[in-house]
Amino acid sequence: MDLPPQLSFALYVSAFALGFPLNLLAIRGAVSHAKLRLTPSLVYTLHLGCSDLLLAITLPLKAVEALASGAWPLPLPFCPVFALAHFAPLYAGGGFLAALSAGRYLGAAFPFGYQAIRRPRYSWGVCVAIWALVLCHLGLALGLETSGSWLDNSTSSLGINIPVNGSPVCLEAWDPDSARPARLSFSILLFFLPLVITAFCYVGCLRALVRSGLSHKRKLRAAWVAGGALLTLLLCLGPYNASNVASFINPDLGGSWRKLGLITGAWSVVLNPLVTGYLGTGPGRGTICVTRTQRGTIQK
């Protein structure tokens, strides 16, 4: 399923036009709340917003690349820089969403115990670990992909591959024997594991809501808020990571579906700010999972 280059261009540009200002607003709102009281959810939201902002900045270049049918438009040394700037936030976003979901679940299932131990510095440690994991994996993969290129003067250098038609292609012409297992490991560790954590936490939040004394309307709203991270993972990041699994099983399935998955992944910069809920001046609703206990209402 190959999308027309013009449609791919329009989708990337639209994601940038919507996602860039939304993430600026989300970061601004989170910073405003952090000045009053820094919480673990705010730490995750700030990292997710900065991650999505970096991803959004790369989308115009991705749009130009799509319009040129995959040809790399910049000087060759910029390819690995673009690869890190584009794919690091694409993978890190799943980890931050899982961390947000875990905080909601712990706040709902163990309100008093979690309130006693939650500290922003622990959340900073989690965020640093997520960034380190993503960057180390991407750096290792890029290093392995380019390490032999200096000995093979025919095509490849710094992630660039020159196909037969002479057009430079950044990363997409990566040696399939190296690309398939590397992308599969990325997806298992940086998508499917966060997806399982997010799904488990979502079910836990739903169970806590069922036992709560909230009105039906507030239960529905809280359930929607808790499920936002899971929805973003499935709709935006799911297709791209599913294509990595499919291409590992059957190499003929990877190409066109991977391009479509990259487009849906780009739209995570639009949905993530809506999930975190710090776009306005009011409370960050996106970080709340509410449960009613005998002593009152606990919010995370």
Swiss-Prot record:
Site (Important for receptor activation): 145, 172
UniProt tissue specificity: Expressed in pancreatic islet beta cells (at protein level). Expressed in pancreatic islet beta cells.
Assigned keywords, A-Z: Cell membrane, Disulfide bond, G-protein coupled receptor, Glycoprotein, Lipid-binding, Membrane, Receptor, Transducer, Transmembrane, Transmembrane helix
Disulphides: 79-170
GO CC terms in record: plasma membrane
Chief location category: membrane
Means of activity regulation: Is also activated by synthetic agonists, such as AM-8182, AM-6331 and TAK-875 (fasiglifam). AM-8182 is a full agonist, while AM-6331 and TAK-875 (fasiglifam) are partial agonists that potentiate the activity of the endogenous ligands, such as alpha-linolenic acid and gamma-linolenic acid.
GO BP annotation list: glucose homeostasis; insulin secretion; ligand-gated ion channel signaling pathway; negative regulation of interleukin-1 beta production; phospholipase C-activating G protein-coupled receptor signaling pathway; positive regulation of calcium ion transport; positive regulation of cytosolic calcium ion concentration; positive regulation of insulin secretion
Residues spanning the membrane: 9-31, 42-64, 80-101, 122-142, 179-200, 224-248, 257-279
Entry keyword annotation includes Glycoprotein: yes
GO molecular function: bioactive lipid receptor activity; G protein-coupled receptor activity; lipid binding
Disruption phenotype: No visible phenotype at birth and during the following six weeks. Male mice tend to develop a slightly decreased glucose tolerance after 13 weeks of age, but this is not observed with female mice. Insulin secretion in response to glucose is unchanged in mutant mice, but it is not potentiated by fatty acids, contrary to what is observed with wild-type mice. On the other hand, wild-type and mutant mice display the same inhibition of the first phase of glucose-stimulated insulin secretion after prolonged exposure to fatty acids or exposure to a high-fat diet.
Glycosylated residues (UniProt): 153
Segments on the Cytoplasmic side according to the record's topology features: 32-41, 102-121, 201-223, 280-300
InterPro entries referenced in this protein's UniProt entry, alphabetically: GPCR_Rhodpsn, GPCR_Rhodpsn_7TM, GPR40-rel_orph, GPR40_recept_FA
Functional description taken from the UniProt entry: G-protein coupled receptor for medium and long chain saturated and unsaturated fatty acids that plays an important role in glucose homeostasis. Fatty acid binding increases glucose-stimulated insulin secretion, and may also enhance the secretion of glucagon-like peptide 1 (GLP-1). May also play a role in bone homeostasis; receptor signaling activates pathways that inhibit osteoclast differentiation. Ligand binding leads to a conformation change that triggers signaling via G-proteins that activate phospholipase C, leading to an increase of the intracellular calcium concentration.
Family per similarity comment: Belongs to the G-protein coupled receptor 1 family.
Official protein name in the record: Free fatty acid receptor 1
